[in-house]
């Protein structure tokens, strides 16, 4: 989150209050994951302070907590250097399931290490968008897009390819 900690806690509590009557889970972000989801701006990253993560968890009761450990939304301009020391400390100090935003471009080895160290959910949206675009372009260039359903099929195939690739990387195939 780009909000100061106190504001982030207050906003998250407000959202949780709205979500709970509907049985909806709430995921919140603490620390500042760099980049931006649509790649339109470069936002500086600030790693999550483990003490702040403990306070955030205690004061909000959030269902899942996305932390900043050197990860960034969108495509990386350089190879990310993840702070596994911070991840390990947050995982040790909290009980809330941990989330990694900005998974696109992280190496398979680092994905596995994240999972082994406490991350339970990894977001890979940008990789999915890129795979969909690449698949649609390939189908279009091959003359295989004759209408809406062809386009939709190519989009689904692109998303499937990326999801399948990451399922294999994460080692979660056959573990539904």
Q: Model-derived features: where do they sit?
A:
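Alpha/beta enzyme core
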Residues: 1-94, 108-124, 130, 134-138, ...
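Residue-level marker of alpha-helix boundaries and capping positions
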Residues: 6, 44, 101-102, 157
């Amino acid at each position: 989150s780009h909000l100061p900690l106190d504001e982030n806690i207050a906003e998250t509590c407000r959202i949780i209050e709205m979500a709970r009557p509907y049985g909806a889970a709430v995921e919140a972000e603490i620390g500042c994951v760099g980049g931006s989801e649509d790649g339109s701006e470069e936002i500086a990253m600030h790693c999550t302070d483990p003490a702040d993560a403990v306070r955030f968890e205690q004061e909000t009761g959030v269902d899942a907590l996305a932390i900043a450990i050197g990860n960034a939304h969108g495509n990386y301009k350089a190879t990310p250097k993840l702070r596994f020391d911070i991840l390990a400390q947050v995982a040790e100090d909290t009980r809330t399931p941990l989330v990694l935003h900005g998974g696109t471009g992280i190496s398979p080895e680092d994905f596995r290490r994240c999972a082994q160290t406490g991350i339970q959910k990894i977001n890979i949206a940008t990789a999915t968008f890129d795979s969909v675009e690449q698949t649609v372009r390939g189908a279009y260039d091959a003359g295989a897009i004759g209408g809406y359903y062809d386009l939709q099929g190519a989009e689904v195939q692109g998303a499937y390819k990326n999801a399948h690739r990451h399922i294999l990387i994460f080692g979660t195939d056959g573990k539904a």
